[in-house]
A protein has these predicted regions:
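Alpha-helical transmembrane segments and immediately membrane-proximal extracytoplasmic
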Residues: 2-473
Length: 473
């Protein structure tokens, strides 16, 4: 009997099935189909990821374009604002009779803000709240702070310029955000960029301006998510204002002492003094405002009395030269030609001006107070006054606004990193000494400065002050 060695069928010859763990079989076709399915799924994921990246890139490009628009507008506004302040200052210095109009300007400012200012009277605190929310800032805020700040300086009020500039930058950013229908996170980034462009353009310090936008709204936090936008905004605003002819004040540190134990001890003690000075400044403005509100119910009467008190202080202290920006004070501090009285008088007249409701800013007066105080300390301890005047500028500014990283960047902008180690010491010690106080009550306390202040975490500076007052009572 013959045997047939061939397979019973062709299908059996082609059977490549493999056993599965559960006893079943899978074929080559199953493998091919599964592979195709996996490739298709990967292609879909890649396509979705590509579309998402393109959308994000387009959104970032759109936001960056808006940042440039805001910064260009702010650069022009800063140039116009600084030019108006220079004109007002020159006129006042040559026409002393203009001081007589300070009460008129005070009452006019109070009336306009009361009846037509909407929420503009909240100033930079409104800018902070808008940056952390979505609230639109009406365009009239920029107009009002521009005009009223200029009139304050024209008639002799002692104030600065940063506050008005940040309000202008915040207003421009808020309105462009509204026109572009930005989402909350993009609105937030654009607002911080507007703040950065204002600071960089007004003070000629683009590095500090970039970090100021990221740091201003918070205590204990830097918002790096807006970092690139703040950097672009600050430099764009600065270069725009510079190109239009803005000139910035410059002070030079003549010599830097060696980092010896004695020098470090002097710097640490000075930093503590600077921090306490900033606390005194913020307390003075707040107290003057509170006293006027408590004892004078009519807002026009408050403005009138406030202006008359400022004029009386000028007359009694022979302090007419401290009116306006008084930028000469910083130069005198660097030259070692200031006394403790210079810092004290500037602090008093500025607190009386801002507490009475006049428009302006706080930073330039803080610079002058710090430089005058530092220069005096330098002469007292036998260290180059320009060195301690620079530390005083930075320390009082840092403690007053709660911005230590911005302060370090400003040291690079203004003094090219000279004495960097000393700058860092002053920035962080004055920041700690300043506590949860400052010129911006709306600042959010994200990370308390000390463990003992943990109860303030998550609240605002205003709430921390109120809590402290309740404990005292």
């Amino acid at each position: 009997m013959a045997h047939n060695d061939k397979p019973e069928s062709a299908n059996e010859a082609q059977d490549h099935s493999q056993p599965l763990d559960d006893g079943g079989f899978f074929s080559l076709n199953d493998v091919i189909m599964a592979g195709r399915h996996q490739i298709t799924r990967s292609e879909h994921l890649l396509a979705a990821d590509t579309r998402r990246n393109v959308r994000n890139l387009l959104a970032s490009a759109k936001l960056l374009a808006l940042v440039v628009i805001v910064s260009l507008a702010m650069g022009v506004a800063a140039w116009a604002f600084l030019a108006s302040l220079n004109t007002a200052t020159n006129y006042r210095e040559h026409h002393a009779w203009i001081y007589a109009l300070l009460p008129v300007v005070g009452m006019a400012t109070a009336w306009v803000y009361k009846n037509h200012g909407l929420a503009a009277k909240r100033g930079n605190n409104l800018v902070i709240d808008s940056a952390l929310g979505t609230r639109l800032i009406h365009m009239r805020m920029a107009v009002l702070t521009f005009v009223c700040s200029t009139l304050t300086h024209l008639t002799g009020g002692s104030a600065g310029r940063e506050g008005a500039a940040v309000q202008i930058g915040g207003t421009i950013a808020s309105n462009i955000s509204s026109l572009a229908h930005l989402k909350k996170h993009d609105h937030h980034d654009l607002m911080l960029a507007g703040i950065s462009s204002a600071f960089g353009a007004v003070f000629g310090s683009p590095l500090a301006g970039a970090f100021f936008g990221m740091e201003m709204c918070f205590i204990g936090k830097i918002d790096y998510t807006a970092g690139i936008y703040c950097l672009v905004a600050s430099f764009t605003g600065y270069f725009t204002s510079l190109a239009l002819g803005t000139e910035y004040e410059a002070n030079v540190i003549a010599s830097v002492p060696n980092m010896t134990p004695r020098t470090v001890a002097i710097v640490v003690i000075s930093a503590i003094i600077f921090g306490l000075t900033a606390r005194l400044f913020a307390w003075s403005v707040r107290t003057v405002k509170s006293l006027y509100g408590r004892f004078i119910t009519n807002y026009l009467a408050r403005a009138l009395v406030g202006a008359l008190v400022v004029l009386a202080a000028y007359a009694m202290l022979d302090a007419w030269k401290y009116a306006g920006l008084a930028t000469w004070l910083s130069g005198a501090g660097f030259a070692g030609n200031t006394t403790l009285a210079d810092a004290a008088i500037k602090l008093v007249v500025t607190a009386l001006t801002l507490g009475a409701g006049f428009q302006g800013g706080e930073v330039t007066p803080l610079f002058g107070i710090g430089a005058a105080l530092g220069g005096w300390i330098g002469c007292l301890v036998g260290i180059d006054p320009s060195f301690l005047a620079a530390l005083g500028m930075l320390g009082v500014f840092c403690a007053g606004l709660n911005v230590p990283i911005t302060t370090c960047m400003m040291a690079i902008d203004l003094f090219h990193g000279t004495a960097a180690g000393f700058f860092v010491i002053v920035a962080f010690i004055s920041y700690l000494v300043g506590g949860h106080r400052g010129v911006y009550p709306a600042q959010r306390i994200v990370s308390p400065k000390r463990r003992s202040l943990i109860v303030d975490e998550g609240g605002t500076v205003a709430e921390a002050i109120e809590r402290h007052n309740d404990l005292i009572e």
